[in-house]
């Protein structure tokens, strides 16, 4: 059955809906195509019925049938916190992220983010610089580092853990990033937003985290730069001024 899940994931480029429909209608496996597709795999992978599949993900909406990865899935056995925010972040957002991530990894927490430009990249780099651990969840194929500016970071993160539900060189699509965010939320026991706009991918991730019953933390910001964080705090997110505000929960 694992081979069947892998086959349809490769054939349909990791798209949950297409894989689901193929399984539902009991689509036949083309053995010749299967052999061809399997030969393209460069990374490790796990399926939803495998023993090493991340347990937390089994309980989210539309859990990926297959996860492709580089690095060690055992990182997910530790307490994980999602650290997310704006792509076009301010110096304040960068500083807040660095300080909080440094303190979080000192406490043994693993930083989960999306390797995007801005806050995501700051979170990953700070974790690495602080001798901590970090997990990247991609919105592109596992062998397609995106954005290109983070290629060097991608290479470093291969020694930590990089995950994608999209195989090989599947290029990013606009709708892949919101879907990626459900995995970030699913792998994280807590979610920290350090800077955000009201309408953003960050807020989509927050929605997934709340749907999954996770605690959401937000760093307050200026009304011009971080309306999303301030709005979250108004709605009940836990205000963060130091790492203690997160660890106490």
PLM ranges: what are they?
Residues 1-52:
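Short, small/acidic-rich helices and loops at N termini and domain boundaries
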Residues 48-249:
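Glycine-biased, small-residue-rich flexible motifs in mid-sequence functional cores and linkers
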